[in-house]
Amino acid sequence: MQLHILGSGGYHPSSKRHTLCSVIPEVGLILDAGTAFFRLDRFLDERPWNIFLTHAHLDHVIGLTYYWGLTQQRDVGPITVWGSENTLWAVKELLFSEPLFPKMPPYHFVPITSHESFCINLEREGCDPMSVVPVPLSHPGGALGYRFDIAGRSIAYITDTTLEAASAYLKVIQNVDVLIHEAFYPGGYEEMAQRTGHVTIRQAAQVAQSAGAKRLIIVHVNPVIDFNQDQREGIAATFPEVIIASDNLVVEI
């Protein structure tokens, strides 16, 4: 399976990065719907798709409004959007409100109401059901992270959150093959990260170490304060199997 990081940035797009959206095309799994959502035009087809939203901040959901452009020249299968009740309410009632974007796409919204694991039938030939475990994160307005197990592979997706919240999800993400984790700030910005509901790149490495993750992919990169070479080398020394994601990165899982 291949993981495509379509957008690797946070907060707002820049000349280098669009905001978060990733896809595993083989299983129809989409992670968040930031400004990079338009890049799904290379993948969407008539099979079913599942979008998992972490929260309703615009850098994670604005791409949901791009549906009509993505479907103008192709037939697209049913799209199910998963998220907390609060996130889905914000998407339906605010993002798609009459003054902002009055034409709701034919998404099927399914609220996640507990942190218990559940399985999804992907309705794709040759695909086993996918196990999903939602985990609570610490971010203004609330957020969810996820662990996905499918086809003998495990992926954790954790953004946006603080280091203190890691105790709530470390057990769930133990020994994952790939940990996709935000790092909105370089080292030295720990106080700012805590205040805004984020982590630094050093803290993300600590989480990966504690979880026993095999690989760490850093996303939600700050569009204003990027990581310098010393910080990149420092994180690699702490956790060698790390990639600081760039847009359109492809990772074999």
Predicted features by range, described:
Residues 163-249:
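Cap/insert and terminal regions of metallo-dependent hydrolase folds
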